[in-house]
Regions:
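Intrinsic disorder/low-complexity signature
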Residues: 55, 167, 174, 222-225
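Coupling/switch segment of ABC-type P-loop NTPase heads
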Residues: 153-157, 162-186
C-alpha cells in the first residue's frame, strides 16, 4: 500500500464503519436527494470482492427497486472517480442479473444509479460540483456518460450540509479535531485519544465511540506513519 493510499484509508474505513447501516444510509440519501427514504427499503450492496483489490467500493446500497446508490469518501481530489464508478456499477448490475435474463426478450427493470463523492480533504473543492466520465474521452463525440456529484463534507461551522444531518456533522468534526491536534504538535496517538474523549464528552459520535473506542483508535493510528501524518496535517 502506498503512503498516500494508507494515510487516506483510515478515513475511508471509519466512514464505512460509521455510516454503513440502513438507518444512517436512508437519512443520508434523503438529505442528498430530497427523496423520502425508508430505512426498511435500504439493502446494502457494498462491493468487497478481491477482484477489485484496492478498488473496493466504499458504500453502495439499493433503495427498494428504484435506485442503486454508490458513495465514495475521498480526502484527495480524484478526477478518475467517474471511471471507478463505472467499474463499480457494472459489477453491481452484474450481480443483479442472471445470464439467462439478459438474453430475455422481456425488458429487465433496473434500479437507477446515483453516484456521490463525499469529499473531506484540505484542498478546495466546490460543493455540489460534477465529475464527468466524458472528460476522460479522447473524442468529444461519445455515446456513454456517467456523472458523479461531489458534496463537500469538510468541517466548518458554515457548512450547511453538515448542519442538516448530525451524524455527518459529527463524523466531519471528529476527523477535523484529530487533524487540528496533530497540526498543533500532539502525537498522533494523543490526538486520537484526546479527540475521541472530547467528542464523547460533547455528544459527538458519542454512542459509536463508546462502543468502538479501541477499534477507532486502531483504524486511525495503524494506517498512519507518525511523520507522514504530521507533515500532511501541518500543510
Amino acid at each position: 500500500m502506498s503512503k498516500d493510499h494508507a494515510k487516506n484509508n483510515y478515513r475511508d474505513s471509519l466512514f464505512r464503519k460509521y455510516f454503513e447501516h440502513p438507518d444512517k444510509l436512508a437519512a443520508l440519501h434523503e438529505l442528498l436527494t430530497g427523496i423520502p427514504t425508508a430505512e426498511q427499503n435500504v439493502e446494502i450492496k457494498t462491493l468487497k470482492s478481491v477482484l477489485f483489490n484496492r478498488l473496493k467500493n466504499d458504500i453502495s446500497f439499493k433503495v427498494g427497486d428504484r435506485f442503486i446508490v454508490l458513495f465514495e469518501h475521498q480526502s484527495t481530489i480524484n478526477p478518475n472517480m467517474p471511471a471507478r464508478m463505472l467499474l463499480y456499477s457494472a459489477m453491481l448490475y452484474r450481480k443483479m442479473l442472471s445470464k439467462e435474463s439478459i438474453y430475455s426478450k422481456k425488458l429487465i427493470p433496473l434500479p437507477a444509479p446515483e453516484f456521490y463523492v463525499l469529499y473531506n480533504g484540505k484542498d478546495p473543492w466546490k460543493d455540489n460540483s460534477k465529475l464527468y466520465l466524458s472528460s476522460a474521452f479522447a473524442e468529444n463525440q461519445h455515446n456513454l456518460e456517467l456523472v458523479v456529484t461531489v458534496r463537500n463534507i469538510r468541517y466548518n461551522k458554515d457548512n450547511e450540509l453538515l448542519q442538516k444531518y448530525k451524524p455527518l456533522h459529527d463524523y466531519s468534526f471528529f476527523v477535523y479535531d484529530v487533524e487540528k491536534r496533530v497540526a498543533s504538535g500532539d502525537s498522533l496517538a494523543d490526538a486520537i485519544r484526546s479527540a475521541t474523549d472530547y467528542c464523547i464528552n460533547h455528544n459527538i459520535m458519542r454512542d459509536y465511540l463508546l462502543v468502538n473506542y479501541e477499534e477507532v483508535f486502531e483504524m486511525m493510528s495503524l494506517r498512519w506513519n507518525e511523520k507522514d501524518a504530521k507533515k500532511y496535517w501541518q500543510k
